[in-house]
Amino acid sequence: QVYNYVGPLYGQPLKVGQRAVLLISTYSDGSHTATVYEYDRAVGLAVIVGLFLLATVLVGGKVGAKSLVALAVTLVCLFWILIPLLMKGASTLLTVFLVCAYITVVTMVILGGVCRKTVCAALGTVAGTALALLFGLLSQSLLRIDGLRLTDVEPLLQLRQTGTPLGLRGLLVAGVVISALGAVMDVAMSISSALTEVHTVAPDRDGRALFRSGMNIGRDMVGTMTNTLILAFLGSGLSFIIYLYSLGLDPRQLISSPYMATEVISGIASSIGVILAVPLTALITSLKIGRASCRERV
């Protein structure tokens, strides 16, 4: 027998020929029942991912192909290294930071080759990520918010009751670090690459002039990147924000809710990482970039 319970918030109305995922239960008498779990979205997801891969390679060429390799490495690190370590009880923040640093180094080497430009970008990224982590911890302590107040933490609490030694209190800041990593890498690599070009065109420029150029370039990037991060965090929680707004809460109640405090910490801590990556990368690059040329494999 196959059951499909359909309601406004659950169940899937199916038509003849549509594929679905079933949950099959086997009883002691050998009988079976099946319940419709969800649409089978595997084919649709494969098409969407295929279009993404195709667009990346067609537009980006060799660099696009390299970026896909870097993305694959990132996913492997997150799903086969980070999550298993956290499930075994490893220190949440230290593990996340070290994995992000590893992802940064591997990604930079894949995209930029082995050179001082890449090293400077990687150092700027790691430094910016570390400051985002520290700012997140400070903000979390100041606002008295911890990982136990996250909206989706209840299933993890149930998981801990089964004996899984998962540390929950650092998940908020850990999520901030992971979310900000891509933007921080983007800013750091852009500044390092730009200063490399400036040095190539004007090799007589000293470190101070290169640093000023890096700051000028970085200021133009900070505004859009900060906007991107803030909007990304707010957009991901838009439905819950609408729900809070519909309650007609007093503004002080609204801004004091754990959810709003969590979103503020997430958005601002990520932006801090991007902002501070600008002077850090500009400083590191201006001190180091003039001494070596890249050994890139194109």
Describe each model-derived feature in a short phrase.
Residues Q1-V2:
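PDZ peptide-recognition modules
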Residues D29-S31, V59-A65, I110-C115, G237-L254:
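Transmembrane helix-loop junctions in multi-pass membrane proteins
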Residues V173, G273-A277:
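Hydrophobic alpha-helical transmembrane segments of polytopic membrane proteins
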Residues I289-V298:
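Residue-level detector of conserved catalytic or cofactor/ligand-binding positions
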Residues V6-V43:
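Extended, hydrophilic extramembrane loops/domains of integral membrane proteins
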Residues L133-V264, I268-A269:
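Generic detector of multi-pass transmembrane helix bundles and their immediately adjacent loops
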Residues G50-Q158, R169-S179:
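Transmembrane alpha-helical segments that form the functional core of multipass membrane systems
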Residues V36-A42, G61, A65, V69, ...:
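Alpha-helical membrane-interface segments at transmembrane helix boundaries
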